[in-house]
From Swiss-Prot:
Biased composition range(s): Low complexity: 619-635, 734-744
GO terms of biological process kind: endocytic recycling; endocytosis
Positions of post-translational Phosphoserine modification: S553
Name by which UniProt lists this protein: DENN domain-containing protein 1C
Listed Basic residues bias regions: 504-514
Keyword Transcription: no
Domain cDENN residue range list: 182-318
Cell compartments where the protein resides: Cytoplasm, Cytosol; Cytoplasmic vesicle, Clathrin-coated vesicle
Domain dDENN: 320-398
Motif residue range(s): FXDXF motif: 401-405
Amino acid sequence: MESRAEGGSPAVFDWFFEAACPASLQEDPPILRQFPPDFRDQEAMQMVPKFCFPFDVEREPPSPAVQHFTFALTDLAGNRRFGFCRLRAGTQSCLCILSHLPWFEVFYKLLNTVGDLLAQDQVTEAEELLQNLFQQSLSGPQASVGLELGSGVTVSSGQGIPPPTRGNSKPLSCFVAPDSGRLPSIPENRNLTELVVAVTDENIVGLFAALLAERRVLLTASKLSTLTSCVHASCALLYPMRWEHVLIPTLPPHLLDYCCAPMPYLIGVHASLAERVREKALEDVVVLNVDANTLETTFNDVQALPPDVVSLLRLRLRKVALAPGEGVSRLFLKAQALLFGGYRDALVCSPGQPVTFSEEVFLAQKPGAPLQAFHRRAVHLQLFKQFIEARLEKLNKGEGFSDQFEQEITGCGASSGALRSYQLWADNLKKGGGALLHSVKAKTQPAVKNMYRSAKSGLKGVQSLLMYKDGDSVLQRGGSLRAPALPSRSDRLQQRLPITQHFGKNRPLRPSRRRQLEEGTSEPPGAGTPPLSPEDEGCPWAEEALDSSFLGSGEELDLLSEILDSLSMGAKSAGSLRPSQSLDCCHRGDLDSCFSLPNIPRWQPDDKKLPEPEPQPLSLPSLQNASSLDATSSSKDSRSQLIPSESDQEVTSPSQSSTASADPSIWGDPKPSPLTEPLILHLTPSHKAAEDSTAQENPTPWLSTAPTEPSPPESPQILAPTKPNFDIAWTSQPLDPSSDPSSLEDPRARPPKALLAERAHLQPREEPGALNSPATPTSNCQKSQPSSRPRVADLKKCFEG
């Protein structure tokens, strides 16, 4: 579309000839045949055949395949004639047709047909075909030409090709002239197809920018067909502009000095001549090596274009180049509309005066700083001036125009005094928006994830604090963290948990049954609950209400699991005491009589109330009377109660115990008073009796007693071995020898009530009617009790085994 048939003859072509390959560069190619025979243009006959061999015939090896290429001749008026060549295999000769019509595909096909006829020695048929085509004139620019042997040349409209006539005529071939009103398409247009295949997108954009700047551009390639196709395709990208300077698709060897011309040019040079060209003084020449796909330039022509235009070309060129159709041509047409579409607003129309173009108005437009800078350079370009003159000529002649360029200007809105490229921006946003969002997401996703994790962990910490403070959670046995109570966890197990403080946290207190002792009569065996330890009464958190989760359903206690759990606990604190419920009730058959039901308060019996115990005087005779009645009370009770192992014990403070015992206000309280001094029972073998004195100074007890529940002083009981030959010495001593000795006068101190948990199964059973009477502990008691002999023997067997 870069050339037009201007003022030419009505014939389809001007001259056809066949030239032989010369032996050297200094010789002229001889003409073997020509048509018409009477062609007498001596200038053309001397100059044109040299363009048929635009390579170094002395060094270039013969080509094994047929090659098609084109050269162009420009006269003083700027009119061009194209020479379409077909180089035979082996480069022995070249067929050439000279025409002003840029019908590349049509003439290449015609040359193939004539070449086949000449190869078969059908010279007459070839001349007849050329004669018919030469005498046929074109009726219009959109004509279709049908060539047939025996019936001449038929010309029809561009709607289609008529069917061949019947008779002896043989259809040779049909040629469809290209539509000048349409854009080049892929793959129909050979030149454009060769360009997008051979040259990269970036180099195509660079070549386009160099041509817009009217640089001296030089292309080199080793294949003539590729070289000329790239040259013509690059000119076609300038539509509606037209390259007005020197155009030589293939430069013959005798014209290599043209490369040193100071004016702009677009020249194609065969690779065999490239070395000779580089030896010349080339300055400010843009060189595109098609074979190496490199672009050498000293200018910043791409940066001189508006950024939005460059972005449009780079983003969409590769996509449209891979698809058939007019995509590539229309893409560059849109770029031209964005660059020069504002020329409409610079057209000045005065009544009775011809239409003119105002350069000042064109430059006064404010489409943006980059485009304004480009316009200041564009007004001096020859191609822009020729474009404006062609438009003004049509307007002043009264001819309207509505070509593809004008339609594109209207479509993209590149007029009205500014470059309105909002559609380009929208297209770029759609095309590149996905990559932009992906990059933003890739950068922000790690930060968002870290923020989310930090917020989540902080929220969990706050929730855990709130759960510790307000939640209905319980402390699991042996742990320091709160967790929801399991449905299978019995309230009896929660009653057996030690009242301890873990890491500054507290747990709800266990239910107390002290109210039962204040109200009167006795209750079923094992139903009593030991009182709180002295530490628990003095702790500030002892006033907390009982958690409702402790009063679960009345499930049976898994005694074996409890014993194993107690054995697995590894607390190493010595001399610690804690209240515990006796395991004697676990040996009985009725478990409900040993533990209170969830719905019945522990301080209220089912039928009656226990009588309140009378307060005992604080005097030494009372303690002595309690000791004298120990034998009578022991005959009624079948066994004594000990506490579990020290794995669940809690260390008590002697100072607190002394303070509690010294306070006279405590004795007026009907509730049980705290133990003034902890007591420990030691079991010492006979062969280690010599070490008892050392054990008395540094006690490391493995059995300890704890106060359980108050009882009348008339029924004390002391645990002591009955015979010394059992090799076990039972002693009782305080934890702190330095504690106040007056604490021994406390009549309300009581003996242990529970046996060691892991040895509870060794205790003998007793009758259901037997009562558990508490005993008052004393120091260094060696009384023998007949009822305790079997138990001591069992303990001895356990230790020896």
